[in-house]
Amino acid sequence: MIRLIGPGGAGKSTIGALLAERLDVPFVDLDRHFAGRVGDISEYIERHGYDAYARENIEAYCSLFREAVCPGVVALSSGFMTYANDAHPEYGRIRREIEEGV
């Protein structure tokens, strides 16, 4: 799996969709996946706070694998690599896998 990380507006979603098409693999934009689960991101953060957003966003990432979507390319949310280590029980493992390219 290829995970695209970077700041908002960097082109992760655009490049991710093109790359997935070229490789003929599924593409998931984590922000869109999150919004499909719980609604508008800004409203969610305003209502529940950033820590809750981080926890739910990590859960959305984990759900990709439970739901057997298993994308070939995933565009991560802009702050995904900056969450607190205790944001979610799986976050430490996920972050290490991303950093190590697993």
What is the predicted function of each stretch?
Residues 77-102:
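ATP-dependent NMP and nucleoside kinases share a basic, alpha-helical "lid"
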